[in-house]
Regions:
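Juxtamembrane inter-helical linkers in multi-pass membrane proteins
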Residues: 163, 171, 259-273, 309-322, ...
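Membrane-water interface segments at the C-terminal ends of transmembrane alpha-helices
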Residues: 1-28, 40-155, 181-203, 208, ...
Length: 547
């Protein structure tokens, strides 16, 4: 336990303490001077306001898309309802920075839609200009977090409450506002909070759209331009962490004021079946809400197969050379991604299993600290972790290699492991929580040690949950850019996300960059499908059979 806590502190807390120390210490004493200097700079104040605005707008726009879709898929039955649920999750399988490239090609100043508008009506719309473009991409990428959590909350409500409200004359929007929304608020708040944190953490989308008046890009610019001695970069990192933790606190405080419990689900009724007109209206609503969110998948696919696509609504020449470039001439980006993400996933599965067991079955002190530290990376932006590692470990040489940790590819594996650890821990915790301890107690009564019981009994029963958590960790690592872009030692050691960033910096590289984006989508989609399938097969019924 002590060794594990020490390891987690070195990997998670120590880099964060280093960032905090530079931001609030001067000459060995605490000082507020760097923070005051931050708020005195107009550029930094604008970046802070833009970051808050982007987070709030992304949540608001995402809610306008997600909440109606959640109500539609949970409360009503119509042909193709399952397909709507699958389509609604598709934005999550495309990395946001890849979506930014695709949106720029479809909705940009010289994109497909604006060229058609210019040709037929003589006007263009600045969809992708400045902060507008960033918010548009982030809203249409992260809204499934709100959708999935809201749908889960609505699906768990007692329908008798709704029927009672209808019998008392409450219907339509009033029913939603007075009954459904308050009861589903915890689920909605979880999705909105996750969306807000992901938006302020997102570094790739603003960089792809060449917009730096946000906190995460400003931290990146300060570190890459002025180096690790620049105090402003660390102050920006502290502000980013404060925003994430502040959002968590506000959500918790807001939910603590209300009562959201329901007494069972005895009054549950099946979803309302829609007639022909209702079905047509439902699909029109789906097309209106989901259509824009699915544009990046089409755009990135066309761009990956285009040789010439400039100032025309569609590519004029198609080619397979872009895939030849990334698979034959520059295969290192994909190979590095598979190696780094696989190693990080294996490490996360091992750590997740041990941490979950200690939290649920352990009898040692400090378990609450173990839980807190292993969850912290969810609230820490990737650029902050990257800056912390550069500050904390750039002078430590890897035994046997002789090179500083931050000059090797190992730093990427470690940071990926840290960032994805909460997924593995939560996955292992959930499946272990479903396992009755009777089998473990029986094994110990027969003379097996706790360690042997864990390896021979507990671990096999946790396999599917661990694999699901490992797959989620693999996906998160494979498409990470926020921390990767600062930590890649050399181009030849760069993973897929870094390769995309390099390629799209030039017009001639957009095709290969899009081809790498398609590979990223395939990896994320395959991993998501496999994780979902494993999670469904590792439910309570399966556990009871094993017990």
């Amino acid at each position: 336990m002590a060794s594990l806590l020490l390891l987690l502190c070195a990997a998670i807390l120590y880099p964060l303490v280093q960032v905090l120390g530079v931001a609030v210490m001067e000459g060995g004493w605490p000082t507020a001077r760097p923070l005051l200097a931050f708020f005195a700079r107009p550029l930094f104040r604008e970046a802070l306001l833009n970051t808050l605005l982007a987070g709030v707008l992304a949540v608001a726009i995402g809610s306008l898309v997600a909440v109606p879709l959640a109500l539609l898929t949970v409360r009503y039955r119509f042909p193709g309802r399952a397909l709507v649920g699958a389509l609604a999750a598709l934005p999550l399988v495309i990395p946001p920075f890849v979506g930014a490239v695709a949106f720029q090609q479809v909705l940009g100043r010289s994109g497909t839609l604006n060229l058609l508008l210019l040709e037929h009506w003589g006007v263009t719309v600045p969809f992708m200009e400045g902060l507008t473009g960033v918010v548009l991409v982030q809203s249409l990428h992260y809204f499934p977090f709100i959708l999935l959590n809201t749908a889960a909350a609505l699906g768990g409500l007692d329908r008798s409450l709704e029927e009672a409200a209808r019998n008392l004359g409450c219907s339509g929007f009033r029913l939603f506002r007075r009954v459904l929304l308050p009861l589903a608020l915890p689920g909605y708040a979880a999705g909105a909070l996750l969306t807000f944190i992901r938006v302020i953490d997102d570094l790739g989308t603003p960089l792809m759209l060449n917009y730096t008046k946000l906190l995460a890009p400003q931290a990146y610019v300060r570190v890459t331009t002025f180096g690790l001695t620049d105090v402003d970069g660390y102050v920006i990192c502290v502000i980013l962490v404060a925003l994430s933790l502040g959002a968590l606190w506000l959500a918790k405080a807001g939910l603590a004021r209300g009562e959201f419990a329901v007494l069972g689900r005895n009054g549950e009724a099946p979803p309302m079946r829609l007639g022909r007109r209702g079905t047509v209206f439902a699909w029109l609503l789906v097309a209106l809400l989901l259509g824009p969110a699915l544009l990046p998948h089409l755009g990135i696919g066309l761009l990956s197969m285009s040789k010439v696509w400039s100032l025309t609504p569609l590519p004029t020449v198609y080619t397979a050379a872009n895939y030849e470039e990334i698979l034959v001439r520059s295969p290192q980006f994909i190979a590095n991604t598979l190696r780094y993400a696989l190693l990080a996933a294996i490490a996360d599965v091992a750590l997740g299993a041990v941490i979950a067991w200690l939290l649920l079955r352990g009898r040692v002190r400090g378990r609450q600290w173990l839980d807190t530290i292993s969850t912290i990376p969810l609230a820490i932006p990737g650029v902050v972790i990257a800056v912390g590692y550069l500050r904390a470990w750039s002078g430590w040489r890897v035994p046997g290699l002789g090179d500083p940790l931050t000059s090797t590819w190992l730093v990427l594996v470690i940071v990926y492991t840290v960032r994805a650890l909460p997924y593995a821990v939560r996955g292992a915790y959930a499946v272990l929580q479903q396992l009755a301890p009777a089998l473990e107690e029986a094994a110990q009564n027969l003379g097996a040690s706790r360690a042997r019981t864990f390896v021979r009994i507990t671990l096999p029963l946790m396999t599917r949950g661990l694999l699901a958590g490992g797959l989620l960790a693999f996906i998160a690592s494979a498409v990470d850019l926020s921390s990767t872009i600062l930590l890649v030692p050399r181009v030849e050691l760069g993973p897929l996300s870094y390769g995309i960033y390099l390629y799209v910096q030039s017009a001639v590289g957009r095709g290969p960059g899009a081809a790498l984006g398609v590979v990223a989508i395939v990896l994320a989609a395959a991993g998501t499908w496999a994780a979902t399938a494993l999670a469904r097969r590792s439910g309570p019924a399966r556990v009871r059979d094993s017990a």
